Amino acid sequence: MIIRTPEPTGENGPAGQRPRSTLAGVRPDDHTVACRGLCRVCGREHVLYDNGARRYGLELMDLLRSRRSLDLRGAAPDHQPRLSTPWLYREARGKMFGVMECLAPDGSRRILRAFSGQYNGLWEIDGWAPPLFDSRKLTAISAATEAEIKELGMELAAAGGDPERSRILRRCRRRLSQDLMRQIHGLYRLTNFHGREASLFAACGCGSAIPTGTGDCCAPKLLNIAARSNLVPLGMAEFFWGRSNRSGSREEGRFYPSCAEKCAMILGFMLCGLEARHADIVG
């Protein structure tokens, strides 16, 4: 998920010297806002701008187009069929991808990459930012409950014309689904740039009413792995790739800001502390 880029030269200074920050004093009309959110801990809104990260997004588009796979290490595109990009043009449709330029402790630049949600049933793919939870634990807690839900569905189908029995079964199935979602949300661990960790519930500040998919978008994945890897994000960009979504609100090759419907409520916490890290860069 981390790619080293050449040491900065020219206007950023020779290799080995701390680069000039492009972030100090940035105003909203200077750069496109990549992601933003209100931190419920400090009470402030935090923002990360594009800051030129779109060029890395365009490079990733070229790779996806030429490789036809999320395996970008040089293997043949048919080496891992589940990673093939033609999947994005079928019934599942396309998805968002993200890139983030970061500064490493040694002064080098790193590029992180992420895809939203799962890719063809996979949460983790080499070279891409991982989810905010342990996917093995997710599989473990999901298996048993999903089996119960499936069994209730079969009982519901067999209930036939018994309305009272059907009502009870539907209520039980709904309760099981809600309990499973709470357990899944309980697996998420968010880290910010103060080095503080929080659960999804604490970061959202909204109890158990958390929209499905919160924390699975590109921005949370990228911010989380950057914070945990002691990297300082300099800029981020997200784009859509594949067949347009059913509503037509996403088109291939176009850049979009981070998800406001699901992830804005946690991005404030995740971005908290980044301004101080940027100030350290400026010196």
Positions of PLM-derived features:
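Catalytic cores of nucleic-acid editing and processing enzymes
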Residues: 1-283
